[in-house]
Regions:
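A short, N-terminal "cap"/entry segment at the start of jelly-roll beta-barrel domains
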Residues: 1-47, 118-120
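A hydrophobic/aromatic-rich effector-binding and dimerization subdomain
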Residues: 3, 104-120
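Short histidine-centered beta-strand/loop micro-motifs
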Residues: 22-24, 43-50, 67, 73-74, ...
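Short acidic-glycine-tyrosine-enriched beta hairpin
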Residues: 69-85
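Ligand-binding loop in jelly-roll beta-barrel domains
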Residues: 86-111
Length: 120
């Protein structure tokens, strides 16, 4: 078995014409992604409506997430959100410098309302 480290903060392309999502790990129930955003945002009048629960942390940069049914949230490095399945949301803005680095964990659950946000 060959186990070697990797870094979420390396191999960032200089040019990012669109948001870059890289799958780091995946099985039938979980997908872990690194997402790179450089001034990117959701298309106007577009809302994400995902079938999976998503836990996402902003590791670098700043961003704002809006929701259909609640106030927008500004995110700074270290801030994380637990987005239940079908929580309609969008990215209003992200910083270009520094590039935003996100770590997202998508969880496919039998009952998507059956989750616990530890720390609340």
């Amino acid at each position: 078995m060959n186990i070697s480290p990797a870094s979420l903060f390396t191999d960032i392309p200089r040019q990012l014409p669109e948001e870059l999502c890289q799958t780091l790990f995946q099985n039938p129930n979980i997908r872990i992604e690194r997402i790179l955003s450089k001034g990117h945002y959701s298309a106007e009048n577009t809302w994400y409506d995902q079938t999976q629960t998503e836990w996402v942390v902003l590791l670098q940069g700043q961003a704002r997430i809006s929701f259909v049914d609640s106030a927008p949230i500004d995110l700074n490095p270290g801030d994380y959100l637990l987005l239940p399945a079908h929580c309609k949301h969008r990215v209003d803005w992200t910083t270009s410098e520094p590039v935003c680095i996100w770590l997202a964990i998508h969880i496919q659950e039998e009952n998507s309302n059956d989750y616990q946000n530890v720390g609340d």
